[in-house]
């Protein structure tokens, strides 16, 4: 009888610990699932802005434009 009570107490203690940890991890997951898409979009926007800025700099730089034009003319000459 003594061991049975000890096992029952251990079972309930284990159940409470698992239940609390599940609730804690569930709340962390719900917070993370709300924040993660925002963080991903933030990095995508930064990358998109960098690409747009680079594209704008390429268009404004006459030397870069000449290099592209030379490359296209070489391709046409080879065809």
Curated annotation (Swiss-Prot):
Residues 1-23 form the signal peptide. Its main location: secreted. One of its GO terms (cellular component) is extracellular region. Expressed by the venom gland. GO terms for molecular function: toxin activity. Residues 49-79 form a propeptide. GO terms for biological process: cytolysis in another organism; defense response to Gram-negative bacterium; defense response to Gram-positive bacterium; killing of cells of another organism. It comes from the Eukaryota. It is found in: Secreted; Target cell membrane. The keyword Protein biosynthesis does not apply. The keyword Nucleotide-binding does not apply. Keywords: Antibiotic, Antimicrobial, Cytolysis, Membrane, Secreted, Signal, Target cell membrane, Target membrane. Belongs to the non-disulfide-bridged peptide (NDBP) superfamily. Medium-length antimicrobial peptide (group 3) family. Amphipathic and cationic peptide with an alpha-helical structure. Fragments comprising residues 10-25, 1-19, 7-25, 1-22, 4-25 and 1-23 have been detected in venom but it is unclear whether they have a physiological role or are simply due to degradation. Antimicrobial peptide that may act by disrupting the integrity of the bacterial cell membrane. Has antibacterial activity against Gram-negative bacterium E.coli NBRC 3972 (MIC=10 uM) and against Gram-positive bacteria S.aureus NBRC 13276 (MIC=2.5-5 uM) and B.subtilis NBRC 3009 (MIC=0.5-1 uM). Also shows potent activity against antibiotic-sensitive and -resistant Acinetobacter baumannii (MIC=1.8-3.6 uM). Shows cytolytic activity against human and sheep erythrocytes. Toxic to cricket A.domestica. This is Peptide Im-5.
């Amino acid at each position: 009888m003594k061991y049975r009570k000890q096992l029952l107490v251990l079972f309930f203690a284990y159940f409470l610990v698992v239940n609390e940890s599940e609730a804690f991890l569930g709340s962390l997951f719900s917070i993370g699932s709300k924040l993660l898409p925002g963080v991903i979009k933030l990095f995508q926007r930064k990358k998109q802005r960098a690409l747009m800025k680079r594209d704008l700099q390429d268009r404004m730089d006459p030397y870069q434009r000449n290099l592209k034009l030379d490359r296209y003319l070489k391709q046409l000459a080879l065809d």
